[in-house]
């Protein structure tokens, strides 16, 4: 027997089931800071200067969750700094500035020697012959600062949706950032400056690389990037001769994402892209000494591009040589599970990256070309409970930035969640799928859709005509309604279970139906050969449900595999019964039926 309830049940999603950003705030981020420290960490002076140069009046400040404790004081300091700058003014309209006068047919429209109309006509005013009133100069408008504290997506991306709610002119993004290009608003990036134990970092470096001629690239998280030049100078003074450093640039698709490699003099070094024809420095001969824990997406992207990667942990004393081979193996297993998926869901996890719409279009076309069905859904923060509502989906692909597209803790998800790069490998045939170790997480690597050329369209029509002629010849030879293409297709097996999969390409099976219709139409012609009257067996796999004439694998799943499809749908399954009059009356006595016996209550 179930225990007695002492409180009302909790119907909301537990907090531990939410998908949260993996960065844990360190002690130096949560302790109290002075005003001077906040000015330095959040770069108040530089931010105010850029806002003043841009002439922006409505400023949105986007803080990650662990920095919200500093938001009120940052707003006060920024407003005080902005107050010392000249206030922006709203420019007067072009009509007011250009209104002049020549001649007016209606003298009654004048007022004390001035034009009372002030109407813009071809840039000369109304033509009354009187001087138009001088435009009134607008008063300076005070700047408004807003805190954007509820980011629906990953904290590394600029939340343009929240900024548009306050009609912001510019967004100031604080903390770590993926530096993905935005589509609408200008952005001021403030990575914030964190304290680094320089002596401990130098000791770890010398212990890991005792050889003074070791080829190493110094790299740091964006919050520690300010310490890289000084560390490089001190290490070179200690005798290291083959050291390089990195600087932050806005280039997620770089050989090192959002970084350029520079020498001791700050000159950029050309990097080879790994191909045989490319020239420049080969990063596979260099190790990377990374300050602070990088995101997992960066680790996977770098593991095949550099010799090895050493991570210096700033939040603890543990530092080690990192290997991503096991994690890459798990990612490869995830994408293999989608090779036989018939229905793929597209999760839109960003609305701010500039090319997300074209990337969605490309992914849809890739899925359709493979004979599979796709459904697009816009979500906020991902969690297993959201995706579990769609049992029809065999797997998911995330459309987001190169950091947030990777779902690290995906053990709780019922279906695999992969990146667009992994989807491209999953849709490839077994002969074409080659795993080289390269990996990418975002939509930057999605190939744009290829526009159809007129010549290609014409050749495609010729191929369709030839296919119809061939189909007519097959029908004349007695093949009936069977689709030879589907019969000749090789069987597909699930790589995990080894079972035969018959529904991995549902849209390709649906596309074979119009061919059969064309065959029937061609047989109605007078000169067409007579159709065979013999009965043929049609495969049930080709009988898919359709919605408004469009084949829908989701509707097919609802029809064949759902045990409950809504209220009132079980009326046909239960046998109907004749309505009979029941017992009636009052508590003193009841009557069974219209003329039934009366039962008295004792």
UniProtKB/Swiss-Prot annotation:
It is found in: Cytoplasm. InterPro entries: DHP2, DPH1/DPH2, DPH1/DPH2_1, DPH1/DPH2_3. Its cofactor is [4Fe-4S] cluster. Pathway: Protein modification; peptidyl-diphthamide biosynthesis. Residues 584-594 have a biased composition (Gly residues). Keywords: Cytoplasm, Iron, Iron-sulfur, Metal-binding. Belongs to the DPH1/DPH2 family. DPH2 subfamily. NCBIfam families: diphth2_R (TIGR00322), DPH2 (TIGR00272). This is 2-(3-amino-3-carboxypropyl)histidine synthase subunit 2. It comes from Neurospora crassa (strain ATCC 24698 / 74-OR23-1A / CBS 708.71 / DSM 1257 / FGSC 987).
């Amino acid at each position: 027997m179930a225990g007695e309830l002492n409180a009302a049940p909790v119907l909301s999603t537990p907090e531990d089931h939410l998908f949260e950003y993996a960065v844990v705030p360190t002690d130096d981020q949560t302790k109290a800071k002075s005003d001077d420290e906040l000015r330095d960490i959040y770069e108040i002076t530089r931010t105010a200067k850029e806002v003043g140069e841009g002439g922006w009046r409505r400023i949105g400040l986007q803080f990650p969750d662990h920095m919200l404790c500093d938001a009120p004081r940052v707003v006060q300091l920024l407003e005080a700094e902005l107050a010392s700058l000249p206030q922006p003014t709203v420019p007067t309209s072009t009509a007011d500035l250009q209104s002049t006068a020549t001649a007016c047919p209606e003298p009654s429209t004048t007022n004390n020697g001035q034009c009372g109309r002030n109407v813009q006509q071809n840039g000369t005013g109304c033509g009354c012959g009187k001087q138009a009133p001088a435009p009134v100069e607008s008063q300076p408008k005070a700047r408004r600062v807003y805190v954007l504290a509820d980011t629906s997506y990953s904290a590394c991306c600029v939340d343009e949706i929240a900024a548009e709610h306050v009609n912001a002119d510019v967004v100031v993004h604080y903390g770590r950032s993926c530096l993905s290009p935005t589509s609408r608003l200008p952005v001021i990036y403030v990575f914030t400056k964190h304290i680094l134990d320089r002596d401990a970092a130098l000791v770890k470096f010398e212990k890991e690389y005792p050889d003074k001629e070791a080829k190493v690239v110094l790299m740091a998280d964006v919050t520690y990037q300010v310490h890289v030049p000084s560390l490089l100078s001190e290490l070179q003074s200690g005798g290291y001769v083959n050291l390089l450093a990195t600087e932050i640039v806005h280039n997620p698709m770089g050989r090192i994402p959002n970084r350029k490699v520079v020498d001791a003099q700050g000159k950029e070094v050309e990097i080879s892209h790994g191909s045989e024809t490319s020239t420049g420095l080969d990063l596979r001969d260099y190790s990377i000494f990374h300050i602070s824990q990088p995101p997992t997406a960066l680790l996977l992207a770098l593991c095949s591009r550099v010799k090895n990667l050493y991570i210096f942990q700033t939040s603890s004393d543990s530092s080690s040589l990192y290997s991503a081979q096991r994690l890459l193996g798990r990612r490869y297993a995830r994408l293999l599970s989608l090779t036989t998926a018939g229905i793929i869901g597209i999760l839109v996890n960003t609305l701010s990256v500039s090319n997300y719409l074209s990337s969605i279009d490309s992914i849809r076309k890739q899925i359709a070309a493979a004979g599979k069905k796709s459904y697009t859904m816009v979500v906020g923060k991902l969690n297993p409970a959201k995706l579990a509502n769609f049992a029809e989906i065999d797997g998911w692909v995330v459309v987001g930035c190169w950091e947030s597209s990777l779902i690290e803790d995906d053990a709780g998800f019922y279906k695999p969640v992969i990146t667009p790069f992994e989807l491209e490998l999953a849709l490839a045939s077994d002969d074409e799928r080659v795993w080289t170790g390269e990996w990418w997480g975002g939509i930057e690597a999605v190939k744009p859709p290829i526009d159809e050329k007129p010549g290609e369209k014409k050749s495609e029509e010729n191929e369709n005509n030839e296919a119809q002629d061939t189909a007519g010849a097959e029908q004349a030879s007695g093949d009936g309604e069977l689709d030879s293409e589907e019969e000749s297709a090789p069987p597909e097996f699930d790589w995990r279970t080894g079972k035969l999969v018959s529904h991995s390409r549902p849209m390709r099976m649906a596309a074979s139906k119009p061919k059969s219709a064309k065959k029937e139409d061609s047989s109605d012609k007078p000169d067409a050969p007579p159709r065979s009257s013999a009965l043929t067996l049609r495969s049930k796999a080709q009988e898919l449900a359709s919605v408004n004439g469009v084949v829908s694998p989701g509707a097919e799943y609802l029809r064949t595999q759902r045990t409950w499809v809504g209220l009132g749908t079980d009326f046909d399954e239960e046998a109907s019964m004749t309505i009979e009059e029941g017992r009636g009356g009052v508590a003193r006595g009841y009557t069974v039926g219209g003329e039934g016996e009366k039962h008295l209550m004792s």
